[in-house]
Curated annotation (Swiss-Prot):
It comes from Orientia tsutsugamushi (strain Boryong). It holds the Pfam family tRNA-synt_1b. Its main location: cytoplasm. A motif ('HIGH' region) lies at residues 39-48. This is Tyrosine--tRNA ligase. Keywords: Aminoacyl-tRNA synthetase, ATP-binding, Cytoplasm, Ligase, Nucleotide-binding, Protein biosynthesis, RNA-binding. Its EC number is 6.1.1.1. Gene3D superfamilies: HUPs, RNA-binding S4 domain, Tyrosyl-Transfer RNA Synthetase. One of its GO terms (cellular component) is cytosol.
Amino acid sequence: MHFINEFINRGYFYQSTDLTRLTQISNSSQIVAYIGFDCTAQSLHVGNLMQIMILRLLQQCGHKSIVVIGGATTKIGDPSEKDKLRRIITNDEIQQNISGIKRSLQKFIKFDETKNDVLLLNNQEWLDSINYINFLRDYGRAFSVNKMLTMNSVKSRLERHTPLSFLEFNYMLLQAYDFYYLNKYYNCNLQIGGSDQWGNITMGVDLVKKLSNNEVFGLTTPLMTNSSGEKMGKTVNGAVWLNEDMCSPYNYFQYWGNIEDNDVIRFAKLYGEFSEIELSKLTELLFNNVNEAKKQIAYKITLLCHGRDEANKALNTAIQMFEHKKADENLPTFTIKDCNNLKVGIPITELLVTIGLAKTKSEGKRLIQGNGIRINNIKVNNINLVVQLQDFIGQVITVSLGKKCHILVKIAK
């Protein structure tokens, strides 16, 4: 399996420096590629999934890859696709986030220092020790401010007259230096990132060529949206996280089971590692039974992230909920510890906020008015409904938002 050919076939390709030469090198020798992740949260999410699948592909093709966690650059913040200065994250938060991100990645790839296992690095290791004056003297001359001002991440902010701090302006210099450092000490010759990173990546390519004259490349992936143009991994309830403590395997399964019909085959190629034969069968199934096709892709993608046991549980729960109208213990669960509240009763809008189906009581009210809320599969029409102890069947009720999001609410024993 040739890396670039498979990269293009799956739909990962957007833009590259000297694609012909990169293809030649990757077909004839081991490349060393790096992908970076900022550590702004305690888990990666579906929006990061394409980069993770690329790391898997590199490993499967026998190439070496490096994951760089931005322990240092996260303190600054990438201005790409941002309208305002990001909140400064503390060192303690960064360390917690790094631990969570590693857990996300370990679901998909193996870390080690053997021939083609993935190497995990934190750019804090080399950036924290940089002397500012020496950095300006040794590397500042290699960067053109004129060119930096034409980068989309900078240009768009200036055109919209939104503030761009000098702190953020330095981000692209540090990312470029990351590539130079990795090339010098780890023989890294390829940086891969999203299309919004093209300017930062090409600056790194230029820096390496100017300072060491080594042959390096940049490769970007498209910004992933669904058929409606919505960014991948975002829902009304926030990001779809990869770590199970932030998004249950069942909710992860439901996210993929709820994709649009037009996205099934595309997402199967991008995220499911379906073979050509499996894709052919899935295409035929999509034509005859779209729900079954979605169930298959949801199962396969959940299997990759959460393992067979959790994927089986999620599938069985979905079957019971939507085909047999039966709730199951594998649904996300919220436990009410103080049942005295239930003797008086809990307003439905308050309950929706408490269990996370609404962010505010006002939003809960709107969901009810839009016929979006059910309790034990019965539509809630009254925004003033009070949920009481007698509503619990066997000390459990199922609260549903639409057809796909369900939470078991239990009374503590």
